[in-house]
């Protein structure tokens, strides 16, 4: 679908000039010379030595030897898509950013989702924060909102970032473990850098094992500024709210998917867009006037703190739709360069010390990863508006600048290109008053590390709290150092003993004495139990064999599909299965290739005469789906299999002989996502 579309926006039109279709063409060298042979190198005789004059071999091999570029130090494993953003109403009251003014304007975007810790080839369903980086191609230049799916971070000052990443990455003496935080150095860092407490609570929650990129929130993490035409500023935090709601995997399921389909999240995103089920996210902002900066019990500049939505409501201002897959992952997803310093008039920075460090680091890392200062000229990074300056030369330069002048000020070119006034669209930094002594120290207002960690805990449902306890128990159970284990338990005892004590018992640590923070506040916005629940794009595995009731299956599938639910057929063999009346269904997966963990729900149909091995495989699927709290529907022989497992009357298990009622009940069960009360 994505390769057979009309040009959708200015960015798509720009990229079209760089796209190349090789199918049906003659093979050439990079110099355009047609090649007559591509299977054998040039040799002196059939069994003789290869000749150095074989320019085609040398070009082909040299290019191959240099195909790889350094992967990102963090966020190496990522996948991306194109789309568009549209503001709902003008935000003129708060910002002069043009792309936030006109509801009729669609701004092209490019969004890259990623894990943080793992290498480029690591699994996607690991426990980890997820990157959520958006590049807006606006008429005023590129604006990058470089965020995560968690609204806070581990550290407050960017100078600690190398230490955090060194601790999180595989341990250097043996390069183990990959894409995991369950090891000694990470938890040693956490215990000795207790500002991380709030972020760790999020990381140990279900937020760090999302069901899909389409079902996770995004956050700008930092505090930025909106500045309007009059020069008035507001502190702002950015939120992406998924239209499908916020949903997660369970931990056992996530680990199994990592082995069964390490590309699970990118496959889900790719297939959704190819099927026309375009992911949608609403953009929300929290706004605090500068006059109210000190009216809260948190510092608005602290990146380890949220602004609770009950205190600072999220104003929904627009929607982003991802509607086109990339044409080439390397050229687009791998070579895209995000940078929080890519801003437009009306959006400015604050003194968040983590943000300030990122403003240096992102440009610096692109220089080595993309080979020099001209990464902005790569097709995916080019703005859709013209750019003119006196930057010249360097590796990979593509622009051919005409004229003799490449400096400012000048008279030979009438002092052009010349700076634009603020009225002409020139970027003017917000005139913040700054004063103080040069010091290396933490603000007193940054020193409360546990209150919001307790707020997060208070906001969780009992199920979510149990998942956090289990996650801590798993992670610390992998830690070899008893000292580190004990330090972490004592650290989180300052949050709540309701967490620290069961974790201590699980790993054999001494029970902590602290009862934890006295904070009693909670926030409904933090629990996934309060999220939107929709059946759209859920995937149901239909276990089926020859002799099934064709009319009943058709009726059920029609109901599921009318609600946007997708069905895929699973059996013992690929090929065709026939119903009792003769109609046919083509099988999508065998029991070997389609695991229950790859589906949101099961619909167990069976068949007229099922052999024992088919039943054994079907029952395995049923048991695993049930253990992962997934909806299960069954008819006919499927009901018997559920009865044998004594789960027919359990929540989220749907049976029946009236197909109208059965179909509606199964749809409702699928919409709930998980059924925890069983």
Swiss-Prot record:
SUPFAM superfamilies per the record? Class I glutamine amidotransferase-like, Heme-dependent catalase-like
- Coiled-coil region(s) at which residues? none
> Pfam family example for this protein?
Catalase-rel
The record's subcellular location field reads: Cytoplasm
Region annotated Disordered, chain positions: 1-32
Where does the record place Basic and acidic residues bias? 1-26
InterPro entries, alphabetically?
Answer: Catalase, Catalase_AS, Catalase_clade2, Catalase_clade2_helical, Catalase_core, Catalase_haem_BS, Catalase_immune_responsive, Catalase_large_C
MF-aspect GO terms: catalase activity; heme binding; metal ion binding
- Isomerase found in the keyword field: no
* Active site feature: 75, 148
The enzyme's E.C. designation: 1.11.1.6
Q: Which cofactor does it need?
A: heme
| Gene Ontology CC, one term | cytosol
Which terms under GO biological process does the entry name?
Answer: hydrogen peroxide catabolic process; response to oxidative stress
UniProt catalytic activity = 2 H2O2 = O2 + 2 H2O
User: Which protein family is it in?
Assistant: Belongs to the catalase family. HPII subfamily.
Kindly provide the name given to this protein in its UniProt entry: Catalase
Give the organism, scientific name.
Alkalihalophilus pseudofirmus (strain ATCC BAA-2126 / JCM 17055 / OF4) (Bacillus pseudofirmus)
């Amino acid at each position: 679908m994505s390769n057979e579309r009309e040009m959708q926006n200015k960015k798509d039109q720009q990229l079209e000039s760089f796209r190349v279709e090789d199918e049906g063409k003659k093979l050439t060298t990079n110099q355009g010379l047609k090649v007559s042979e591509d299977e054998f190198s040039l040799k002196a005789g059939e069994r003789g030595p290869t000749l150095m004059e074989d320019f085609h071999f040398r070009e082909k091999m040299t290019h191959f030897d240099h195909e790889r570029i350094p992967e990102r130090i963090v966020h190496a494993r990522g996948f991306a898509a194109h789309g568009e953003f549209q503001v709902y109403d003008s935000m003129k009251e708060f910002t002069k950013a043009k792309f936030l003014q006109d509801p009729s304007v669609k701004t092209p975007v490019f969004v890259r989702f990623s894990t943080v810790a793992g290498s480029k080839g690591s699994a996607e369903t690991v426990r980890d924060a997820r990157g959520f980086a958006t590049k807006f191609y606006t008429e005023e230049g590129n604006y990058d909102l470089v965020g995560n799916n968690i609204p806070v971070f581990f550290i407050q000052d960017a100078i600690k970032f190398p230490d955090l990443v060194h601790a999180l990455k595989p341990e250097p003496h043996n390069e183990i473990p990959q894409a995991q935080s369950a090891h000694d150095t990470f938890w040693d860092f956490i215990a000795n850098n207790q500002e991380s407490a709030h972020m760790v609570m999020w990381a140990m929650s279900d937020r760090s094992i999302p069901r899909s990129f389409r079902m996770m929130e995004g956050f700008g993490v930092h505090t930025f500024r909106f500045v309007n035409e009059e020069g008035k500023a507001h502190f702002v935090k950015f939120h992406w709210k998924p239209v499908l709601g916020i949903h997660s995997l369970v931990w056992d399921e996530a680990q199994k998917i990592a082995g069964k389909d390490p590309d699970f999240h990118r496959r889900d995103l790719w297939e959704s867009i190819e099927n026309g089920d375009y992911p949608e996210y609403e953009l929300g902002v929290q706004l605090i006037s500068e006059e109210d900066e000190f009216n809260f019990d948190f510092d608005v500049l602290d990146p380890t703190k949220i602004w609770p939505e009950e205190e600072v409501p999220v104003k929904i201002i627009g929607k982003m739709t991802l509607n086109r897959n990339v044409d080439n992952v390397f050229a687009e997803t791998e070579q895209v360069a995000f940078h929080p310093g890519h801003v437009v008039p009306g959006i400015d920075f604050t003194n968040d010390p983590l943000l300030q460090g990122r403003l240096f680091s992102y440009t610096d890392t692109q220089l080595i990863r993309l080979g020099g200062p001209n990464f902005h000229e790569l097709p995916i990074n080019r703005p859709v508006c013209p750019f003119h300056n006196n930057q010249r030369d360097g590796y990979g330069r593509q622009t051919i600048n005409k004229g003799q002048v490449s400096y400012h000020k000048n008279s030979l070119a009438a002092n052009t290109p010349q700076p634009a006034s603020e009225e002409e669209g020139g970027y003017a930094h917000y005139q913040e008053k700054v004063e103080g002594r040069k010091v290396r120290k933490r603000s007193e207002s940054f020193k409360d590390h546990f209150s919001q960690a307790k707020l997060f805990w208070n906001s969780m449902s009992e199920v979510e709290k149990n998942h956090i306890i289990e996650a801590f128990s798993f992670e610390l159970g992998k830690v070899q150092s008893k000292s580190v284990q004990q330090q972490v338990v004592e650290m989180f005892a300052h949050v709540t003993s309701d967490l620290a004590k069961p974790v201590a018992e699980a790993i054999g640590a001494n029970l902590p004495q602290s009862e934890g923070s006295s904070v009693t506040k909670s926030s409904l916005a933090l629990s996934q139990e309060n999220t939107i629940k929709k059946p759209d794009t859920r995937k149901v595995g239909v276990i089926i064999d020859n002799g099934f009731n064709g009319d009943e299956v058709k009726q059920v599938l029609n109901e599921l599909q009318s609600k946007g639910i997708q069905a895929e057929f699973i059996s013992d063999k690929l090929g065709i299965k026939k119903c009792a009346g003769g109609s046919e269904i083509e099988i999508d997966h065998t029991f070997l290739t389609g695991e229950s963990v790859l589906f949101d729900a099961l619909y167990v149909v069976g068949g007229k005469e099922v052999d024992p091995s088919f039943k054994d495989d079907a029952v395995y699927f049923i048991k695993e789906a049930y253990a992962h709290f997934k909806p299960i529907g069954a008819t006919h022989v499927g009901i018997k299999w559920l009865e044998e497992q004594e789960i027919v009357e359990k929540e989220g298990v749907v049976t029946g002989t009236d197909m109208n009622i059965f179909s509606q009940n199964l749809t409702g069960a699928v919409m709930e996502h998980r059924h925890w009360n069983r």
